[in-house]
Amino acid sequence: MPIAGTKYAPFPAPQLDDRTWPSKRIEKAPIWCSVDLRDGNQALIDPMGHDRKERMFRLLIDMGFPEIEIGFPSASQTDFDFCRWAIEQGDVPDDVDLQVLVQCRPELITRTFEALEGAKTPIIHFYNSTSELQRRVVFAKDVGGIKQIATDAAKMIMDMAAKAGGGYRFQYSPESFTGTELDVALEICNAVIEIVKPTPDNKLIVNLPSTVEMNTPNVYADQIEWMCRNLDNRESLIISLHPHNDRGTGIAATELGLMAGADRVEGTLFGNGERTGNVDVVTLALNMYTQGIDPGLDCTDINRMKEVYEYSNQLKIAERHPYVGELVYTAFSGSHQDAINKGMKARRSANSPVWEVPYLPIDPQDVGRSYEAIIRINSQSGKGGIAYILQADYGLNLPRNLQVEFREIIQHITDEEGKELPSKRIYEEFQKLYVTQPDARIKFVDHHTYPDPEQKGRRILTAEITDNGVTKTIEGKGTGPIDGFVDALSKYLGVKMSVVDYSEHSLQQGSDASAISYVEMVYPGGKLFGVGINDNIVSASLEAVVSAANRVIAK
């Protein structure tokens, strides 16, 4: 790359030593305006036809956007026709205002009013570019010439609105605001304000777009705060933000801009738009939601939002996209999985409605996702993740030492195969190793116990087993069935074994529930686990002992 300082110069930042926005907090949601059907649509390789537009439009209404920019009706017949459809057949709720975009050109303004005939309180959004670069390179005009473009358009729009009988709302944008000197932007905006003559009951929207993101988010916040302080008739204005994401900080710039005094945000679902996109209003809304602020948008079915986005825009959402990507509620890391597992357990036992689970800033169910894919297993996964999957999907509450033991088995498989293991495969490996044991030597069949006549408090157990398919009867003594069965197997196999840990639980609810038992067995070479599942709790325990014994003699 060329030396940075010889090819690129830093864009100047305003001097605002008494800025107040850093100490502010976002306390309420802004007025939201979707520009998916205009700014988003113009950025598509294959712009939307009517069906794709209508599907997006219905979603935006269902989500609760109070303002929706439906197109640039003077730019194409497609946009004009959709505007007419929305007004005549779109069943637009009374609390939703439709917005259209128009350049400051007389013939386009006339066509725009034709498109809006019969609309309820439509917003006419007129704009012209004001930046130093575009004044010099594109328009070859001085500040006075650029200001006249804006004021001539404002006069024409106000005259036509008056003749049409009123009911219109107005929005002006000094396009490429972030590349415009602040005093120039102020001069042009104030000139438009003077013509529109807004009131507190009929406010003018002054939109201050970061058409191209040119600086750090704090600079945009300084620009917004400066304009909020200096614009004429501020109480009669709605200050709007329209950030883009060229530097990857559109979300941060918007949030700081709201702290700096803005009232409104224009953006798109999941950030579709020219170049790197417009600001993502879904991420903004859910950022607020997770801070306890009502976002004013309904994001409870984020899967539908994703589906409509991908259908209407013919674009795919990245797997790591905040809140909506396939993997954003998923942990592969062992330490993360362990923390999530413990957090979910703590939440189940807590009596607080507050969401507090490590590594999950939002409850996936709040946006229509499930807990099924929170933890997924690969070579980076730990015991907590595997335990969570077996508990969540199959109702198995593995003892901690068994979690450690089984994790090593799964680790070996993932290292060998080099890919993620789905939940079903993990359960199948658990069943094969501990429960079904298809190649096992010993199988449990039945048992009986009776008091030991020679020693009070102890019992004699006789058990029927098969050894490589041959039926055998074995006998042992102990304080109970498990103790006696371990004694019998130890003598029969010639290996001293003893149980050091035992636990069990039901696999379902009700009187016909199966039981699962876990035993940790010590033998001369170490210790390991066995697992048994049976309708009878005692039989499940003895099957767990056989499971462990089979693993001992297989070593």
Swiss-Prot record:
Stretches for region Regulatory domain: 437-555
Reaction(s) catalysed (UniProt annotation): 3-methyl-2-oxobutanoate + acetyl-CoA + H2O = (2S)-2-isopropylmalate + CoA + H(+)
Enzyme Commission designation: 2.3.3.13
Keywords noted in UniProt: Amino-acid biosynthesis, Branched-chain amino acid biosynthesis, Cytoplasm, Leucine biosynthesis, Magnesium, Metal-binding, Transferase
Keyword Protease: no
Cofactors demanded by this protein: Mg(2+)
Positions contributing to Mg(2+) binding: D39, H242, H244, N278
GO cellular component, as recorded: cytoplasm
UniProt xrefs under SUPFAM superfamilies: 2-isopropylmalate synthase LeuA, allosteric (dimerisation) domain (SSF110921), Aldolase (SSF51569), post-HMGL domain-like (SSF89000)
Subcellular location: Cytoplasm
Single Gene Ontology BP annotation: L-leucine biosynthetic process
SMART domains: LeuA_dimer
Function: Catalyzes the condensation of the acetyl group of acetyl-CoA with 3-methyl-2-oxobutanoate (2-ketoisovalerate) to form 3-carboxy-3-hydroxy-4-methylpentanoate (2-isopropylmalate).
Record family assignment: Belongs to the alpha-IPM synthase/homocitrate synthase family. LeuA type 2 subfamily.
Name of this chain's protein: 2-isopropylmalate synthase
Source organism (scientific name): Brucella suis biovar 1 (strain 1330)
Higher taxonomy: Bacteria, Pseudomonadati, Pseudomonadota, Alphaproteobacteria, Hyphomicrobiales
Gene giving rise to this polypeptide: leuA
